[in-house]
Curated annotation (Swiss-Prot):
Molecular function terms, GO-annotated: DNA binding; DNA-binding transcription factor activity
Biological process according to GO: DNA-templated transcription initiation
Name under which the protein is recorded: TATA-box-binding protein
UniProt xrefs under Gene3D superfamilies: TATA-Binding Protein
Organism from which the protein derives: Methanococcus vannielii (strain ATCC 35089 / DSM 1224 / JCM 13029 / OCM 148 / SB)
Pfam families tied to this protein: TBP (PF00352)
Signal peptide residues on this chain, from the entry's feature table: none
CDD domains: TBP_archaea
Sequence repeats, residue ranges: 7-83, 98-173
Sequence similarity: Belongs to the TBP family.
Superkingdom of the organism of origin: Archaea
Length: 181
């Protein structure tokens, strides 16, 4: 049975121009904050889709908090439209690339994290963090496994890798269970 894997965050980046006047952009964009003494970029929060966009003077733009690449692209198009309408020189259809996706799912059981921590590529220090950190090399992702059975997969570039990672972890846990019990 396929696990129900849900994307909870997508981070993308793109280049919308060069030498962006962030003071001017902050004045024309709704919900924009620019405090260069705090952070070198302009922060703009949208409610639909619910994302945060970080725009830097260099023209680099990061979008975080999206639930899909498509949502991030919609948000970026909205910002580009506003900036262009205000007379700024902005790239029309910039190439958007996924930097990271975070997905969640459930194991469907309460794992023994102490047992799993005997495996290679795992870290488990419950005094520091309640989840077990499992680093996979193919796909190159980090899987956090919690005692409740909740799983968080981060470092994804494509959703398919979440399913591959989950299948690998599930198979490894089944093998471990057979060895131990």
């Amino acid at each position: 049975m396929e696990p129900e894997i849900k994307i909870v965050n997508v981070v993308v980046s793109t280049q919308i121009g060069t030498d962006i006047d962030l003071e001017y952009a902050a004045d024309i964009l709704d919900n924009a904050e620019y405090e260069p003494e705090q952070f070198p970029g302009l922060v703009c929060r949208l409610s639909d889709p619910k994302v945060a966009l970080l725009i830097f003077r260099s023209g680099k733009l990061n979008c975080t908090g999206a639930k899909s690449k498509e949502d991030a692209e919609i948000a970026i198009k909205k910002i580009i439209k506003e900036l262009k309408e205000a007379g700024m020189e902005i790239i029309d259809n910039p190439v958007v690339s996924v930097q990271n996706m975070v997905a969640t799912t459930e194991l469907g059981m309460e794992p023994n994290l102490d047992d799993i921590s005997t495996l290679e590529c795992t870290e488990y220090e419950p005094e520091q963090f309640p989840g077990l950190v499992y680093r996979l090399s193919d796909p190159k992702v980090v899987v956090l496994i919690f005692g409740s059975g909740k799983v968080v997969i981060t470092g994804l570039k494509v959703i398919e890798d979440a399913y591959i990672a989950f299948d690998k972890i599930s198979a490894t846990l089944k093998e471990l269970e057979q060895e131990l019990y």
